[in-house]
Amino acid sequence: SCNFNLYQRIYSVNYIDKSEDINVDISTIFTLINNVDGYKSFLPWCKNSTIISNIDNIIIGEIEISKNLINWKFKTSNSYIKDKTIKLELVDGPFSHLNGEWNFKKKDNFNTQVSLYLEYQFDNRIIEMSLKPIFSSIMNSILDSFISEAFRIKNDKQT
């Protein structure tokens, strides 16, 4: 049973659960988060981001992360309902499991509640030891990064 507990601890499922009310309209924040192609232009850790396909409200996107001299890619299938939700599912990458969703709730014409729920598990202990601290810090700050960029876009529209 001791070994089992150790296994559980090492291969635990990791969760991100964040929500913010922001003074940005729903369409701006949804479009920003749904446009995987644009990530590389404002997320400092994102070396490359590509939309491989966008058919019937399902985007296959690939993100390349580069941080602390470590590079890796992962690919997700993102099924979306415009201005409502984006559901993420792992297609390929160093995870045994990754899925989650973004939800968008219109408060009024100028304010939106944005939430991200993500759960993930790495392929093996070695990968987890090298990638978990980086991925965890990225995912814990990703909502803030999107919000900052949404405010920049909003301010550009106003000038």
Predicted regions and their residues:
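Hydrophobic pocket/interface hotspot
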Residues: 29-33, 39, 61, 78, ...
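Short N-terminal secondary-structure initiator segments
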Residues: 53-73
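A conserved amphipathic terminal alpha-helix motif
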Residues: 119-159
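Hydrophobic ligand-binding cavity/cleft-lining segments
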Residues: 2-56
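Hydrophobic-ligand binding "helix-grip"
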Residues: 40, 66-111, 119-121
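Hydrophobic residues positioned within well-ordered beta-strands of beta-sheet architectures
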Residues: 16-18, 59-61, 74-76, 100, ...
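Extended beta-strand/beta-hairpin segments
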Residues: 13-16, 63, 93, 106-119, ...
